[in-house]
Structure formats: structure tokens, C-alpha cells
């Protein structure tokens, strides 16, 4: 079977990203799972290896050489990218120069995917404040990725812990705005997006649970009717599309139903509704997937940890999980061709 090719970036070099990449690629079994293309400042990569006390062999190639390059098992390649910002990096803090570098390396990785050189992208933790200083015009990277890929359909952040995936109909909005932003189409789109992502990650016939909005699932309209007027009609559309969907389940019993029914994915109505339980289940193993974007893109579900830069105490568990999902989804892209 042909291996997928994954682009890997350092995220924000002022944080723990370079250390995490070094620790990840020091593992031979990781390097052999996929063909790996590092998009990074060579000096920052080497600093990460020095911090982590972790070494691995890589080969340096240019962007245009990659199309004819024959990968060697367990040997990543590096496309070295120097930031266009004139100032050097300042470690352990939010800076414009880090933000510029983050956006530039992600653009290179996206271009690799557009050219068909890689099937997925995994980036080390980045900092949104730095990215805004560096030119990001969107509230988060998800909508920036949508712009960069000319994607105008529904997108949402997916959270993953172990074998449980989660999506949400609404996300980074005030609590008072949740109900006005719920719709039958939104519920269906979210279910459908989660279903497609699970299939791309190699899950056959995924089971998806949907959460109710109101206490006790609305109690037949006594505590609210959104379950009847919005959520259930959206679920019915999903069933007609051939998706195996269950619920709507009250928020406080959803995890029990996930375990009982062996659910693969959960659709919630708002940001913290299911992610709280998911993070309790395994915060240190959490992964974020940029849901809906035509290129599979993953990262660890934690931040840059500026205070840990240079200390060699960053734990790579979540980043390794993110890389593994990128490999699986990249394989799904190959299998679709």
C-alpha cells in the first residue's frame, strides 16, 4: 500500500513546537508511518532537536524537487523556509515575527497539498495572538484555512480523544447567540461533515450521536422546543442521506450513550457542551481537526506553552495523536483517488 505524505510544521517557534517535532520524529516507528515533509526554518528545527536531545536524519530538498523525489523509508525531507520578517525570533513570548512565520510556513504546506505533493498537514501548536500580529484577519485559523483553499461551505473545529470525535453546530459565539444560530441545515451540515471526516479517517459506517439543547432534551417541549423544530429534522435529513445517527440525547447523559452504543462521533449544539466531557476523558491526548477543509489538517489540542520553551519538558502525546490522525486521513485521500 502506498504511504500517505504528511507536511509537518513547527507552529510557533517561540513555544514548544520545535521540541515537539523533534521528539515526535526521533521515534523510528513514527517516521516509518508516512512520508514526511518538514516545512521549517532549518535553524529552528535544529534548535528543537538540541532542546529535546533528540536526533534524526533528514534530507533537504526544494519545493520543486519534491515532485520527483523518491522518499526513503524513515527519512523525512526538509523544505527550509526562512521568515520574511526582518527581526529574529523572541522565545517565550507573543511576537509579530512568529506570527508572520506561522502563516508563511502554513501557506507553503497548503501549496504542497494543492500541488498533490502531500495529502495532509499536521502543525505544531500556534498562537492566535501572534498570528493576528502577523497579519491574520480571521478570528481563528480554521476560517483562514477556508479562505486559503477557496472553500465556502460549512466548516467547524473537530475535537478528538482516542476513538471519539466531536463536532459542534455553533462555536466561538456568546451563549446568548446560540439559539438564533441553530438551524435545521446547520444540524445536518455538522452531522454530514463529521461523518465525512470519520470515513476519511478510516472508520467504516460511523455511528453519530446528536446532543439535545435543552434540559432533559426539552421534555416534549416543556423546557424548549428546539429538539422538535430544529435538531430532529436535521437528524432526519442525515438519516435520509444514509448516516447512522442517534439521539438527541440530553447533555448530561450523552457520554453514557456513547459508551453503550459504541458511538464514533458526537454533534453538540455549542462550544462546551460535549468538549468538557471529552477533555476530562483525555485532555493530554486531545487532537483538533480543521473540519470541512478539503485538505486534512490536524494539530494538538493545546497551546504553545511559551513558559516551557527550551526546558525539554513538553509532552508530545497529543501531538503524536494529531500526527497519527493526519496519516490516517491522508491515507483516506489516497484511497479516494
Swiss-Prot record:
The UniProt record lists the keyword Metal-binding: yes
Enzyme category, top tier: oxidoreductase
Cofactor, how bound (note): Binds 1 divalent metal cation per subunit. Can use ions such as Zn(2+), Mg(2+) or Co(2+).
Annotated localization: Cytoplasm
Catalytic activities: 4-(phosphooxy)-L-threonine + NAD(+) = 3-amino-2-oxopropyl phosphate + CO2 + NADH
Cofactor(s) needed by this chain: Zn(2+); Mg(2+); Co(2+)
EC identifiers of the protein: 1.1.1.262
Pathway assigned to this chain's UniProt record: Cofactor biosynthesis; pyridoxine 5'-phosphate biosynthesis; pyridoxine 5'-phosphate from D-erythrose 4-phosphate: step 4/5
Source organism, top-level taxon: Bacteria
Positions with a binding annotation for a divalent metal cation: 172, 216, 271
GO cellular component: cytoplasm
Keywords, sorted A to Z: Cobalt, Cytoplasm, Magnesium, Metal-binding, NAD, NADP, Oxidoreductase, Pyridoxine biosynthesis, Zinc
GO BP of this protein: pyridoxine biosynthetic process
GO molecular-function term, one example from the UniProt record: 4-hydroxythreonine-4-phosphate dehydrogenase activity
Pfam families per the UniProt record, alphabetical: PdxA (PF04166)
Primary role: Catalyzes the NAD(P)-dependent oxidation of 4-(phosphooxy)-L-threonine (HTP) into 2-amino-3-oxo-4-(phosphooxy)butyric acid which spontaneously decarboxylates to form 3-amino-2-oxopropyl phosphate (AHAP).
Quaternary assembly: Homodimer.
More info: The active site is located at the dimer interface.
Family: Belongs to the PdxA family.
Protein name: Putative 4-hydroxythreonine-4-phosphate dehydrogenase
Source species: Pasteurella multocida (strain Pm70)
Lineage: Bacteria, Pseudomonadati, Pseudomonadota, Gammaproteobacteria, Pasteurellales
Amino acid at each position: 500500500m502506498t504511504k500517505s505524505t504528511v507536511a509537518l510544521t513547527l507552529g510557533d517557534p517561540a513555544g514548544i513546537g520545535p521540541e515537539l517535532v523533534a521528539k515526535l520524529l526521533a521515534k523510528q516507528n513514527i517516521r516509518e508511518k508516512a512520508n514526511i515533509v518538514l516545512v521549517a526554518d532549518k535553524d529552528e528545527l535544529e534548535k528543537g532537536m538540541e532542546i529535546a536531545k533528540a536526533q534524526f536524519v533528514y534530507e533537504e530538498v526544494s519545493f520543486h524537487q519534491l515532485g520527483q523525489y523518491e522518499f526513503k523509508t524513515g527519512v523525512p525531507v526538509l523544505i527550509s523556509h526562512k521568515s520574511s520578517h526582518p527581526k529574529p525570533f523572541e522565545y517565550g513570548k507573543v511576537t509579530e515575527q512568529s506570527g508572520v512565520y506561522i502563516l508563511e510556513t502554513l501557506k507553503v504546506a497548503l501549496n504542497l497539498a494543492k500541488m498533490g505533493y502531500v495529502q495532509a498537514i499536521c502543525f505544531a501548536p500556534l498562537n492566535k495572538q501572534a498570528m493576528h500580529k502577523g497579519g491574520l484577519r480571521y478570528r481563528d485559523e480554521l476560517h483562514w484555512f477556508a479562505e486559503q483553499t477557496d472553500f465556502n461551505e460549512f466548516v467547524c473545529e473537530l475535537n478528538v480523544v482516542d476513538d471519539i470525535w466531536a463536532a459542534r453546530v455553533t462555536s466561538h459565539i456568546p451563549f446568548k447567540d446560540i439559539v438564533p444560530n441553530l438551524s435545521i441545515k446547520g444540524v445536518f451540515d455538522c452531522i454530514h461533515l463529521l461523518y465525512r471526516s470519520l470515513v476519511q479517517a478510516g472508520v467504516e459506517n460511523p455511528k453519530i450521536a446528536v446532543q439535545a439543547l435543552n434540559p432533559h432534551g426539552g421534555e416534549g417541549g416543556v423546557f424548549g422546543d428546539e429538539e422538535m423544530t430544529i435538531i430532529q429534522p436535521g437528524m432526519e435529513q442525515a438519516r435520509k442521506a444514509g448516516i447512522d445517527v442517534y439521539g438527541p440525547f440530553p447533555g448530561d447523559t450523552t457520554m453514557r450513550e456513547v459508551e453503550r452504543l459504541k458511538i464514533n462521533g458526537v454533534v453538540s449544539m455549542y462550544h462546551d457542551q460535549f468538549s468538557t466531557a471529552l477533555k476530562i476523558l483525555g485532555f493530554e491526548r486531545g487532537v483538533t481537526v480543521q473540519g470541512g477543509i478539503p485538505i486534512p489538517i490536524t494539530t494538538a489540542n493545546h497551546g504553545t506553552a511559551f513558559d516551557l520553551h527550551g526546558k525539554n519538558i513538553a509532552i508530545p502525546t497529543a501531538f503524536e495523536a494529531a500526527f497519527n490522525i493526519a496519516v490516517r486521513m491522508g491515507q483516506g485521500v489516497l484511497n479516494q483517488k
